[in-house]
Amino acid sequence: MRKRVSFLTRSLGSDALISDREVLVEWVRARRGREADLITFQIEGSLMPQIEAGINTPCAGGKFYQDRLISSLFGIEGRTITAELGCNIPPLLKDAEDLASIQKDLWFAFPAPREIGLCNRFYHDSDEAIYALYSVYREMMRSMRDKGISGHILHCDNPVSEELEALAGRRVFFFSHIETKKTLEILLEYQATVAVRSSALGLIEDLMDEYDVQKIILIDSREDDLHRALEIKDAEHLICGGYCQDSCDFYWKSMVENASVIR
C-alpha cells in the first residue's frame, strides 16, 4: 500500500528583504525604547515568515549579515586589515538575545570568513591574516551560542579545506552555493551532512562510495526531486531545505506544504 512520506524542513537563511516604508515605521514604533537598526529589522524579518510557516529548524540571517560582521570588526579600515583583528561583540550578542527570545533552537547564517573579502596590510602573510580572522569568527560564534543561538551556517561559493578544518563542527555547518564535484568533496571531507539542489544529486550519489554521507538537505525540492533522493537515501536521512531570496511568506509556506510525497 502506498503511503505519505514526510520530511523535516530546515532553513539555511534568507536574503535581506526591504519592506515598504510603512512596515518599517510600524516596526520601529513597536520597538520604541529598545535599541535597534536596519539590520535588526532585516534579521527579524528573515525569521518571522519561517516561524509562521512552521519550519522545523529555522535560521535567521543570511549573506546580508556581513554588514554587521564588518562593522563589528576591530583592526580594519574599509575592507583592509590595518591592525590586529578583534571584534566588538555586544552588537552580535544583542542580535542573538533578541532572536533567541523569539525562537528556541534557532540557527544563524552569515558569510564564511573568506567571503567577506578582507585585504591584509598588517599581518606577515595571508595565512597569518586568515587564521586571525578564523579566531575572531570562533569567538563571535561561541559568544552568540552562549546567548541562545543553537548553531551557525556559514555561506560560501568555493569552500576551502583550511577554513572547514578550522571552523566546521557539530554547531557550524558550511553551505556552498556552487555545487561541483570539487566543492562537494571538500565539504564532505569535514561534514557528513551536505546541502544541495536536485541537480547535484547525481554527484552526491557518485561520492557516497568514498564519503560517509549521513544526511542530505535538498534545496528547493519538488516532488520528482524527493522521489529521486529516496532512491539513494532513506527518508529519515533526507531534509527539505531552503534559502529564501524573494517573497519569503510564500516561499517558506510552499516549502512546508511540499515536504512530503506519496510512495
What spans do the regions from the language model cover?
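Domain-level signal for soluble alpha/beta catalytic cores
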Residues: 1-263
